Amino acid sequence: MAVYGSFRMNDAHACDEARGWYGRSQQKTERLDLLLGSPVPSGVHGADWAFSWRWNYAKTEVRERFLGLFDETLTRYDFDGLELDFSRASPFFRPGEIIENIPTLTQFMRDSQEIVKRHSASKDRELQLIVRVPVGIGENLEAGMDTETWIREGLADILVLGSPGYCVHEIDIGKAVSFAKENGTLVFTGFDGATYTVSPQEGYERSPSSVLRATALNGYRDGAAGVHLFNYDYPSHRAGPTDSNDFNIFDDYHLQTVQDLRETSSLEWRNRCYYLPSPTGAGRADHRLQVPRKLALMGRGAGPEHAMRLIVHDAIDGGKAEGRIGKTELRLRMEDFEDSLDRIHFEVNGKVLPFTPSRTVTNSQGQQWLVFDNPPLQQGLNTILLLLEGIETPDPWPSVHQCEILVLTSDLT
């Protein structure tokens, strides 16, 4: 087993003034000029106090500090390489200074790779550089991380596209793999062991492994060479509630999850849940959020482009024919829709369906999902359209908060 020294390139936890148990380093408290400081974009950790305790990578001293740590770590310890975790977390530059510093961060990556290469030569064995970045290549560039250039220049041996928050659905694996064709950089799909709110499945109400399986299979089918599983050592970041809060205890279900994530042949025979994340609260780090949303009015021009989009890289009909897939479900969690039932327009992949669920599923918090059995799903992109007919403004206004596609190979309990 290879062992890597891992560095969190910017940490959000220290930005919370109320998090007294989470310490701040002497370097930060003595050198506030090296931090992002003020102002802080809305929705970012530290915004409540208008001050960010993250490092400002526009500062030469900050970059040199990390490069020195990389060098010292490989000098003092016999690691197999380094992991630089940029998913935890942007921002890395002050507002208005991001674009001009894109080359700065790219040069920092070149310098980091040079350190790893130098230690590989001195130790006469290959050391690897792993780089973890958020899941959206375009969004990464907006944050100062030119992921495309990093891949095309081969600045990392393994490039992980991993969600900064919990497990998400949409990851730019296909794009990254296309950039890596000429240099052999391995692209991994990555996600946290925890998920956002999802319907009860397999006896669990929190973070069921079915979501991880779906995300992993999509990644493999897009060309990923492997899976990077983050935070799974935390019991609170596994399907739960867990039998024990001991970090060192994994029951059979969670061990099986780790084994399943290794290869497509296991994943395609296991239950999977393809879901749209619905983060709540401040400080959320994930992009491309499609829910929650209110239902738009057809009388005001709403149409097919309002559809929610989920990708399912599996041959649904073929899987059913070979007995691998038993059934499929569409699950929706909605609010304030009861008074507008006669106005709801419902389509799946362009086919108009009656808005009559087969049943409901409810968790211990009283949240309820409407279940539609065997909707007309397809391999690849699936669209789910929910609109209100007419032009009249509803009161209350119906909204959808969660959307899930379940591909089931065995009965859920």
Where are the predicted features?
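Extended extracellular/luminal ectodomain segments enriched in beta-structured repeat modules
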Residues: G318-R331
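Active-site-adjacent "subsite" loops/lids of carbohydrate-active enzymes
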Residues: A2-E72, R76, S199-A214
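C-terminal soluble interaction/assembly domains
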Residues: Y166-H169, K175-A176, A180-V211, N218, ...
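Beta-strand-rich interaction surfaces with strong enrichment in secreted/lumenal proteins
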Residues: L297-R300, D317-G318, F372-P376
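Beta-strand-rich ligand-recognition modules
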Residues: M334-L412
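Active-site neighborhood of glycoside hydrolase catalytic domains
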Residues: E61-L186, V211
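Substrate-binding cleft of secreted/luminal carbohydrate-active enzymes
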Residues: I158-V168, Y204-G283
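Extracytoplasmic/secreted cell-surface and envelope-processing proteins
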Residues: H13-E17, P91-R94, E139-L141, V168-K175, ...
